[in-house]
């Protein structure tokens, strides 16, 4: 998606520059009373709080992908969740519920589809669990 949007933006920027050169664009001042301010996205904004709803966590993962991404800390290592789906399973927030890497959230749970351990390559959940210390029953506390 990022690559497709990048290519689309490139074409659009070239088109807009051509129109500016040809004086075919009318500039309009911004209405400062209707404008809103968005804070700069910081790395800490991607930190996952497992007590939040699975929908909110999934939205955060999608919105902040690829950087800074939705992430959590376990045993002093950062794990970035690259893709996840909502699951109807219930468990304690932060608890790994089964071998499909389903993690309990505030209301239901999140099934992790793709994850990346700090300094490692992205993996699907099955590959990840084979070599991970994160197993069913593990509690991912909000460190």
Give each language-model segment a name:
Residues 1-87:
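Active-site-proximal loop/hinge segments within enzyme catalytic domains
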Residues 51-143:
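An anion-binding loop in the catalytic cleft
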